[in-house]
Amino acid sequence: MDGQDIGAGGGCPFSGANTNKGRRSNRDWWPNQLNLSILHQHQARQNPLGETFNYAEAFKSLDLDAVKKDLIALMTDSQDWWPADYGHYGGLMIRMAWHSAGTYRTADGRGGASTGTQRFAPLNSWPDNGNLDKARMLLWPIKKKYGNALSWADLMILAGNCAIESMGLKPFGFGGGRADVWEPEEDIYWGAEDEWLATSDHAQARYSGDRVLEDPLAAVQMGLIYVNPEGPDGNPDPIASGRDIRETFARMAMNDEETVALTAGGHTFGKAHGNGPVDAVGPEPEAAPIEAMGQGWLSSHKSGKGVDTITSGIEGAWTPNPIQWDMGYFDVLFGYDWELTKSPAGAWIWHAKDLKEDDHAPEVDGSGKKVPIMMTTADMAMKMDPIYGPISKRFHENPEEFAEAFKRAWFKLTHRDMGPKACYLGADVPDEDLIWQDPLPAVDHALIEEADIASLKADILASGLSVQDLVYVAWSSASTFRGSDKRGGANGARIRLAPQKDWEVNEPAKLEKVLNALEGIQSSFNAAASGGKKVSLADLIVLAGSAAVEKAAKDAGFDVTVPFTPGRTDATDEQTDVESFDVMEPQIDGFRNYAPKKFSVSTEEMLVDKAQLLTLSAPEMTVLVGGLRAIGANYGDSAHGVLTSRKGQLTNDFFVNVLDLGTKWTATDDSGEIFEGADRATGEVKWTGTRADLIFGSNSQLRALSEVYAQDDNAGKMVADFVKAWVKVMELDRFDLK
């Protein structure tokens, strides 16, 4: 091909064979198709660093002090292509780090800074992330220098830390260990709106009723990190803004004091940009022309940078000295009355009445010119809201308390999605254990050995507890884990503590019976063991489930040993933040066939969502559901999906019978949630099932997987694969083993 073979119409010479442009995908044809692709993201083969690359090991070779020195030097090394405001990039870097971390939400643990996805769509092109592409490009020489030992995810947060330090406040600490991913995270639901910054009157709005925000969302509009700084839907009402702020920050794991500290502390630095018409701003990075080379929001307004920059449309600094940690934010917030006005870009802002010359901010270009400061409607809520106002007053009167509160809130903001402190790397990790890190006691005793494990398994199976109950409790304990923010899991045995012990899905009466029996076995063993050897309840819960799986397999004719590694410890009530665990209570769980009510999202979609949080592949999800159904580990001992006459045995009967062409399935009512499977010949009802069961025969991909496990030659493979996937779930939070 010489480039001269394109027809007069300019068509593609490959007839679209190698491009998606103009081609309808399966999802276009069938919008309701179950999205299993979220179970196969971020595979090792997609990592350009290689399948064996270990970021934690690479990070250990990093000279962290040298990196910080380079970052602090960068702050004042202004570049002509994107000059630093006031000669200091600190405000820009803080905003970049904040917006990297600020997508986190507690409901599903998704979002946050731990994977570096601000580099990719949609986040790299969100309206609220305007011009942060410049911040990352400014960091490229440092990333280039330190290479594989410093991820983008870590670098963005560390840059924010160094920005704060370079402007006069030593941060609380820094933990490295955020490994980059190499594609967008498609599992995150950002909202149903089909336009950026859609307001609450949009047809697909995230609000309903009296401004009730849809779960699991936290941000108020599509494309915003937190709230609209101009006020709800752009309405400049500080009291209404306070309500939005409280709800949004709570959904991002922040209480009222942390919210005030972050808002006031963050706005002590830098400025907002809106010194020109918004229609002068070019397209975001994902829509920009190829020659823009990844840059977006290129502006045709005058120079398009520095004084002339347009980002949010809001214009001005919050404080008289935007590159210094001080009490300037509260000084001016409480020192003046404020009046509503508009920026040159037309955004609502507030200006101080009769602003003193000394309280003006310098112009960003170093010309010596003085310009007015401003506040946003969200800032005014820090003064006018009946809860935020008194907190702000207290911080204003107690500068050291304010500084400490900001440092701690910033550390929480930037580390909330990293999991327990065991996941933190580097010399700057604070010694203090923080309640939001879900701390665990250290292992202070000798661990059980092979002979002890065998003896304990025998005691468990002789206790009178059923295989189903042992499997159910172990699964309930371990399956709280979320790969999104690395919370939950079996370590800590928090299933015996509030709130988990009272969760409906955990069947409190059954749970109490099992825990009482296991605690008796634990007490007897620990009292008799020599050499300081002990078994934790967390270990015993998992061991009990493993023993039950072995028995279920043996009863089905398969001798297997479920691998078990001791070393879990038991958390205390004092180490458990009940409120923060409340949001983790399952409202539906397809693995346990628990569905107390119908949701707007289908049962099968929620099953896949749960599997994704458990970091399972589609085959792993499939074999686990089939095995749990065969064992009978259903909520309430329900018969739904227990498609076997050998309940309690680890067989492939679920797959054989869900694919049985002699069975006709019919919904029991209009909800389409429960089904009866009748013999086609006699009409006799043989089985009942839920959508979480029938999907394994209905969905073409899951049916293909089910066929593998239903084959006559794969009954043993099904058992082996179940055991492997079971152990994976039991050890998801064993960061000490990784």
UniProtKB/Swiss-Prot annotation:
Main EC class the enzyme belongs to: oxidoreductase
Modifications the protein undergoes after translation, according to the UniProt entry: Formation of the three residue Trp-Tyr-Met cross-link is important for the catalase, but not the peroxidase activity of the enzyme.
NCBIfam families referenced in this protein's UniProt entry, alphabetically: cat_per_HPI, PRK15061.1
Described purpose of this protein according to its UniProt entry: Bifunctional enzyme with both catalase and broad-spectrum peroxidase activity.
Cofactor binding note of this UniProt entry: Binds 1 heme b (iron(II)-protoporphyrin IX) group per dimer.
Source organism per UniProt: Ruegeria sp. (strain TM1040) (Silicibacter sp.)
Pfam families from the UniProt entry: peroxidase
Family membership: Belongs to the peroxidase family. Peroxidase/catalase subfamily.
EC number(s) on file: 1.11.1.21
HAMAP family recorded: Catal_peroxid
Binding, heme b: 267
GO molecular function, one term: heme binding
Lineage: Bacteria, Pseudomonadati, Pseudomonadota, Alphaproteobacteria, Rhodobacterales
Region span, Disordered: 1-26
Cofactor: heme b
Residues with site note (Transition state stabilizer): 95
Residues joined by cross-link Tryptophyl-tyrosyl-methioninium (Trp-Tyr) (with M-252): 98-226
Disulfide bonds: none
Coiled-coil portions: none
Protein known as: Catalase-peroxidase
Keywords linked to the UniProt accession: Heme, Hydrogen peroxide, Iron, Metal-binding, Oxidoreductase, Peroxidase
PANTHER family listed in its UniProt record: CATALASE-PEROXIDASE (PTHR30555:SF0), HYDROPEROXIDASE I, BIFUNCTIONAL CATALASE-PEROXIDASE (PTHR30555)
